[in-house]
Amino acid sequence: MVTIRLARGGAKKRPFYNIVVADSRNARDGRFIERVGFFNPLARGQEETLRLDLARVEHWVSNGAATTDRVAKLIKDAKAAA
């Protein structure tokens, strides 16, 4: 099953997440099909907190990709901001 989920990056105590489309059998930070955005929970000042390619997300969801709970909330937030 294909899922849209967060893949963790960044340094220790400084998380940065890529929002990726991946096969659910692959590791959290492992191989993915496509990167559709990022989420930076510790953004400061003028830094972007969330960037998401909503067209690609809609494409994957229409093709049967499932989203995790956190990614579903981020998609909702991105749509409200757009």
UniProtKB/Swiss-Prot annotation:
Q: Tell whether Ribosomal protein is among the UniProt keywords.
A: yes
Q: Which GO terms describe its molecular function?
A: structural constituent of ribosome
* Keyword Ribosomal protein appears in the UniProt entry: yes
Domain of life of the native organism: Bacteria
Output the Gene Ontology cellular-component terms: cytoplasm; small ribosomal subunit
A GO BP term here is:
translation
Pfam name, any one: Ribosomal_S16
Q: What are the UniProt keywords, alphabetically?
A: Ribonucleoprotein, Ribosomal protein
Q: Which NCBIfam families match?
A: S16
Q: Note the HAMAP family from the entry.
A: Ribosomal_bS16
Do you know which PANTHER family this protein is assigned to?
30S RIBOSOMAL PROTEIN S16, SMALL RIBOSOMAL SUBUNIT PROTEIN BS16M
| Membership in a protein family | Belongs to the bacterial ribosomal protein bS16 family.
Q: What is this protein called?
A: Small ribosomal subunit protein bS16
Organism of provenance: Shewanella sp. (strain MR-4)
Q: Which gene name does the record give?
A: rpsP
